[in-house]
Amino acid sequence: MSSGGLLLLLGLLTLWEVLTPVSSKDRPKFCHLPPKPGPCRAAIPRFYYNPHSKQCEKFIYGGCHGNANSFKTPDECNYTCLGVSLPK
């Protein structure tokens, strides 16, 4: 294969890696945790990854004793657990 062909193949593989969403085996384990509002009484909107619907969903966080499946924005949740960003 010519060097141009190898360069093209390398470029395509790199593009594939960047554009391929996170597979379930590569997804951080905490993305499979259920939402945990915690016992405190604040009402902070947060987002968690729901492995059943395969999307990030809103929940209300109490402000303490939550878990790692709690994100401030849907974009942060989508990037971390799905490997994609929503269009702006």
Swiss-Prot record:
- Kindly indicate whether the keyword Disulfide bond belongs to this entry: yes
Which positions correspond to the propeptide? 87-88
User: Which PROSITE patterns would you find in this protein's record?
Assistant: BPTI_KUNITZ_1, BPTI_KUNITZ_2
Chain ranges of the BPTI/Kunitz inhibitor domain: 31-81
Q: Which GO molecular function entries does the Swiss-Prot or TrEMBL record give?
A: calcium channel regulator activity; potassium channel regulator activity; serine-type endopeptidase inhibitor activity; toxin activity
Q: Which domain of life is it from?
A: Eukaryota
User: Tissue range of expression?
Assistant: Expressed by the venom gland.
Question: Oligomeric state and partners?
Answer: Heterotrimer composed of an alpha-neurotoxin-like peptide of 8 kDa (AC P0CJ35), a neurotoxic phospholipase of 16 kDa (AC Q7LZG2) and this serine protease inhibitor of 7 kDa at an approximate stoichiometry of 1:1:4; non-covalently linked.
Q: By what name is this protein known?
A: Kunitz-type serine protease inhibitor taicotoxin
Species source reads Oxyuranus scutellatus scutellatus
Q: Top-down, what is the taxonomic lineage of the species of origin?
A: Eukaryota, Metazoa, Chordata, Craniata, Vertebrata
